[in-house]
Amino acid sequence: MTQVAKKILVTCALPYANGSIHLGHMLEHVQADIWVRYQRMRGNQVHFICADDAHGTPIMLKAQQMGIAPEDMIAAMSQEHQQDFAGFNISYDNYHSTHSEENRELSGLIYGRLKENGFIKNRTISQLYDPEKGMFLPDRFVKGTCPKCKAADQYGDNCEVCGATYSPTELIEPKSVVSGATPEMRDTEHFFFDLPAFSEMLQAWTRSGALQEQVANKMQEWFDSGLQQWDITRDAPYFGFEIPDAPGKYFYVWLDAPIGYMGSFKNLCDKRGDLNFDDFWKKDSDADLYHFIGKDIVYFHSLFWPAMLEGSGFRKPTNLFVHGYVTVNGAKMSKSRGTFIKAGTYLQHLDADCLRYYYAAKLSSRIDDIDLNLEDFVQRVNADIVNKVVNLASRNAGFINKRFDGKLADTLADAELYKTFTDAAASIAEAYSSRESGRAIREIMALADIANRYVDEQAPWVVAKAEGRDADLQAICSMGINLFRVLMTYLKPVLPSLAQRTEAFLNTELSWDAITTPLLNHQVSPFKALFNRIDLDKVNAMVDASKEDMVTTQKVVSGPLADNPVQDTINFDDFAKVDMRIALIKQAELVDGSDKLLRLTLDLGGETRQVFSGIREAYPDPAKLEGRLTVMVANLAPRKMRFGISEGMVMAAGPGGKDIFLLSPDSGAQPGMQVK
């Protein structure tokens, strides 16, 4: 049946650019990729895009901690994210960043239209301010008790327990996440998006079929509570886009983050030249727009985002496809247990198709959480992919290759059975289309059981030993391989790597529309192992490596220790040879002919030493050091220098130049005391 090709734009939520992709993230990207691959197999024009969410205070602060520019940090993180997604065969057409000129331009455009249309309000507000860090605190940098359900340790914008949204000033007993200080209130002028003006439109959109019923019901609770104007402003210092004509004020990350979908697509249009941005984003667009997101960001995508689009003259999403969280072994992902598994760590140990299959087998169109039970994961992948599907090919391919030079029979051994398999296409297609991949997998595996039962009943290994039955053997094995081909066609959206190897073996593309025509009198390639069983030891090694990731992460430092790592270990006897003493600086003077050295005269409590020290740049007025106690190495061999003999070494910290700091003992220490 010929169908009219649809124009479809698909997005996944933008990963935040301050951390690695983990298996929780991968659920969404795998779910979306399976749906996209299915749509492409059916001939639809699909553009699949994503980007890094690269703005906000967390990125600014983390870059500061690392001692690098935010731009450098997000560039490195983008490269890592794209490598992980490629490793899982996520078939993005474009992966961009919200920190882009396209996004800056579109954010300014949308803000300008909203302002022009009267949907931007400005007023002076009192906001929490960190007196220790000298900065206003964004909502995600304040934690306290939820004002609605009284759950502790909640962020300043929304409660992860009850889902309520509120302002940071409503938190009970707030604390700065940055310094731990109790914030104080200060006034600042902010810009607000008039969300309540869109209440009627949003309620109609909510019940238009654009949302899952669970999401629509949750939104009704928010409508019943009353919508509030949305603060879209953040004060400097902030890493993001400065608001036009408002120096020192920046767009809140959640304003420009969803606009990043548009920015990434605009970037794709500019690169390709044959795509028209307006065809997908103008108000009367006939293209479909789908956002795959997690349930934790429903509020932003179901209220703010469609209202922003409506108020600025753009189209709204066709659907939001919302999924639940990932647990591992029945519990929240845990770094200490090794179940907080990064995508990169997984790929070092296991085939991406394994996780894609397991997620697909559990996913539905509902918002239920998915549990990655690692033992069940091993058993299901081995039982289904290896024992049922791939084994079907290996049981038959050997006879075809050895006895018939890789040539399949010219007729089907059981046309009625084959039709049973191809007739299932409609039901499986409907399951994929409605994001019921778990149901699709169940139907495919039921067919796999039938196919293996056919081979068991026909027993080609017995037929192969009987004289004069070569034609029967070829027909039976060809039937088995044709059934394998149908199964792998159905599984192609889920298992792209295995599908590619299968296509090489079958010497044909796995095409949904081609399954009604069996492979007859067709040449296949010599059979090679298509898929390896999962060994539980590999899974355990991955878990152990994830624990090591946590230890490594905890040990990663920036600043002095990173710049000058701890040197090789010495034993106590070596350390005991160094005699450090408290010394009084009796005199400190410049050294003629040297721009680095000071001449120090030190009193060790009965003995005077002369020491030359390279601290002149840090202490340009050496007289200020006189009368100060310090620490010196007293048994260092005298060193003859151009300016005289140096009889020891004073202890100082820092990289050098102006950044060097002479060590001083605590009060009570006296010249001559040994430092132990």
From Swiss-Prot:
UniProt xrefs under Gene3D superfamilies: HUPs (3.40.50.620), Isoleucyl-tRNA Synthetase, Domain 1 (1.10.730.10), Methionyl-tRNA synthetase, Zn-domain (2.20.28.20), Nucleic acid-binding proteins (2.40.50.140)
Cofactor(s) recorded in Swiss-Prot or TrEMBL: Zn(2+)
Main subcellular location: cytoplasm
The protein's Enzyme Commission number: 6.1.1.10
Placement of sequence motif 'KMSKS' region: 332-336
Residues given in the record as Zn(2+) binding sites: 146, 149, 159, 162
Biological processes, Gene Ontology terms: methionyl-tRNA aminoacylation
Cellular compartments per GO CC: cytosol
Subcellular location: Cytoplasm
Domain tRNA-binding: 574-676
Residues binding ATP, per UniProt: 335
Record NCBIfam families: metG, metG_C_term, PRK00133.1
Function per UniProt: Is required not only for elongation of protein synthesis but also for the initiation of all mRNA translation through initiator tRNA(fMet) aminoacylation.
Subunit structure and binding partners: Homodimer.
Protein name: Methionine--tRNA ligase
